[in-house]
């Protein structure tokens, strides 16, 4: 039988507590460096990033074709799911300059059954994505839909390509931080 001293027992408890704290901190760490994802096929972003990193990435660049499935996943990463409910997403900076929006995939916003169309930022595409602070749109986007960025309260910078010829009503409603 071992003899325990108060000092020895105290040190064991301290090591156990500190060990569990560092494990918890590692699980909650954010990924702040830019992550670049090259999609060979639309609809594959969820499998490229996975659920373990989905809510930890804060800076993302996507190259390749993206569809409704990808946009739904991006929305979740940026703070809003397809129902418009808040998520744990922390995505602040999104660079889509090397991406192309294409038709297909699943619904990205359920309330009004929104699907993607070629070269269009659709209705409600980023609505409620309250983690987004900076967004660069694809260079070939021609249209921005109704309420596309509605309620993006932290969005400060949005890069629109010169190819945009129409912007829907209320597209930027509630974007109170937008400065450029």
Predicted regions and their residues:
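Boundary at the C-terminal end of the N-terminal hydrophobic targeting segment
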Residues: 23-28
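Structural signature of tandem-repeat unit edges
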Residues: 32-40, 58-66, 89-119, 130-143, ...
């Amino acid at each position: 039988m071992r003899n325990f001293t108060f000092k020895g027992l105290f040190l064991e408890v301290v090591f156990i507590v500190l060990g569990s704290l560092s494990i918890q901190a590692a699980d909650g760490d954010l990924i702040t460096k830019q992550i670049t994802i090259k999609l060979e096929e639309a609809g594959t972003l969820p499998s490229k990033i996975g659920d373990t990193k989905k809510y930890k990435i804060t800076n993302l660049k996507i190259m390749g074709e993206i569809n409704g499935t990808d946009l739904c996943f991006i929305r979740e990463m940026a703070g809003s799911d397809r129902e418009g409910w808040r998520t744990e997403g922390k995505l602040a900076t999104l660079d889509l300059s090397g991406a192309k929006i294409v038709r297909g995939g699943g619904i990205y916003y359920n309330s009004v059954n929104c699907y993607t169309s070629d070269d269009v930022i659709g209705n409600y595409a980023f609505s409620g994505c309250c983690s987004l602070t900076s967004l660069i749109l694809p260079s070939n986007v021609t249209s921005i839909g109704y309420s596309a960025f509605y309620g993006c309260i932290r969005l400060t910078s949005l890069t629109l390509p010169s190819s945009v010829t129409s912007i829907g009503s209320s597209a930027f409603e509630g974007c109170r931080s937008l400065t450029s």
